[in-house]
């Protein structure tokens, strides 16, 4: 089945009962299938607007998982995040920047993940959500598989 919820709660609900591949920009997912049929196991989170945002929260910036590299390049971030914008401008081609997502770059676990070094240097943390709880994890621990 192909699911495309418009809110995070519905997406988390579906993940509780089905084993699904999570998709958004698909810049890694589609090439990884090597033209194989993906089957009926896709959760497309690209329609969840709350995941495609850049928000100011107390003393940090919250960048949603489906935020694209182009979104970051065009955003009005403080000067201390200029490095992130410059790194975003170096990710792949313009086509990848327009569809590739921050969350996909981190979750794919590729050794060539363009965004990881910059986000690590900014001491980034990630938010992991399930129906039961929300965890905040330092990116360095997430990368290690902690």
Model features per residue range: what roles?
Residues 1-146:
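C-terminal structural segment of proteins
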